[in-house]
């Protein structure tokens, strides 16, 4: 069953108690304001990734000799790998200082093993090193920008019903702020409960994998990458 943005806006107005459910129907400026606020909420979530519960896979081809790749709509990357045939290789994310300010030999073409993600307008740039020596199929898992809505947009095509309910409560809070009204206590309480639950839907992977240069397993360094061609007996 479709759940349009117009229906969400209408229900948010009733929830905010700015208009009466039995006596009024939002129209005109109220609908325009509601759509603006809804899209402002959706856009603002790009700055607080904890409130975006959806991870997506994105596949692109690395180009021989190219370090930088523009990924539209990308917000953050959890993992980045590449394939040579059926064999998958992992890559390590570097800090900005480590990637851009550390010593290294530029333009070395080999198997990439490091990457750095930098946010840009409406997306992100991914930098990889070593510069690819061939065309590799890159696979990333990350979070992308949420889809903005028109009045007729069926929100169930993009969001779960629990997330739509969260948006309805948040929109009700913003409507109260826009119209100078007090947020009903129960609405505020339910919104805070929903917000906490949303952050627990898909928490980030905070596990740590360490490389031990003094243990039984080999560490990943420049010599291994270049001398072995990246083929390790894992």
What is the predicted role of each segment?
Residues 1-234:
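Glycine-enriched, solvent-exposed interface loops adjoining structured elements
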């Amino acid at each position: 069953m479709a759940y349009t943005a117009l229906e969400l806006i209408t229900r948010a107005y009733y929830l905010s108690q700015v208009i009466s459910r039995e006596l009024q129907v939002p129209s005109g400026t109220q609908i325009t304001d509601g759509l603006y606020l809804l899209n402002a909420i959706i856009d603002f979530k790009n700055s607080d990734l904890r409130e975006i519960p959806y991870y997506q896979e994105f596949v692109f081809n690395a180009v021989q000799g190219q370090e930088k790749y523009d990924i539209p709509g990308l917000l953050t990357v959890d993992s980045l790998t590449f394939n040579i045939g059926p064999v998958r290789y992992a890559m390590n994310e570097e800090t900005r200082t480590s990637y851009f300010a550390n010593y290294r030999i530029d333009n070395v073409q080999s198997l990439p093993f490091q990457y750095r993600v930098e946010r840009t307008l409406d997306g992100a740039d991914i930098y990889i090193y070593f510069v690819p020596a061939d065309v590799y199929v890159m696979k990333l898992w990350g979070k992308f920008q949420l889809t903005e809505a028109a009045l007729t947009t069926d929100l169930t095509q993009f969001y779960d019903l629990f997330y739509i309910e969260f948006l309805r409560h948040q929109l009700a809070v913003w409507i109260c702020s826009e119209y100078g009204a007090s947020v009903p206590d129960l609405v505020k309480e339910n919104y805070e409960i929903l917000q906490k639950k949303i952050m627990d839907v898909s928490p980030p992977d905070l596990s740590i994998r360490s490389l031990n240069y003094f243990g039984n397993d080999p560490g990943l360094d420049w010599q291994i990458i270049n001398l072995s061609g990246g083929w390790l007996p894992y």
